[in-house]
């Protein structure tokens, strides 16, 4: 699984007094790879395409998106539909956070502004990275609800 990345195989060779002649023989048909892709200031599709190695068709990939996005986040479903044929298996994860420009809208005199002000205060008071991630996710879902969008 993803806890053992890269090629798997055995070492074969001969060992004699004062000398060892060993070579790695890959045994696994597929490799597990984790690819972290920063999407700050670019689309997720462009960032993923630029990060991919030449050949992925035989291997199993987990792609973790990082960096900052707008309030909509990343549409993992459409990315999976678009890129899955290029992989034996593809798993996508969104670990992005809401960009700073979204928080600037907290000054609006509106329900959106009130919502963002309340969440920003919680974000500033958060003690752990896990708390911050939950608040970022709450912002993304809340803004989607205010706009009538699905995530």
Question: Model regions: which residues?
Answer:
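Conserved beta-sheet core of the metallophosphoesterase superfamily
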Residues: 1-17, 98
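Accessory, non-catalytic peripheral segments of nucleic-acid enzymes
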Residues: 17-151
């Amino acid at each position: 699984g993803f806890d053992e990345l890269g090629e798997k195989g055995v070492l074969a060779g001969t060992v004699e007094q004062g000398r060892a002649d060993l070579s790695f023989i890959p045994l696994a048909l597929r490799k597990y790879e984790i690819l972290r892709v920063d999407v700050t200031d670019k689309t997720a599709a462009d960032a993923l395409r630029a990060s991919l190695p030449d050949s992925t068709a035989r291997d199993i990939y987990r792609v973790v998106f990082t960096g900052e996005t707008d309030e909509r986040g990343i549409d993992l479903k459409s990315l999976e539909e678009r890129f899955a044929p290029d992989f034996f298996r593809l798993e996508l994860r969104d670990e992005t956070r809401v960009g700073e420009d979204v928080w600037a809208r907290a000054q609006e005199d509106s329900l959106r502004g009130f919502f963002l002000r309340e969440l920003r205060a919680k974000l500033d008071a958060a003690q752990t990275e896990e708390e911050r991630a939950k608040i970022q996710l709450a912002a993304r879902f809340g803004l989607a609800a205010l706009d009538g969008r699905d995530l």
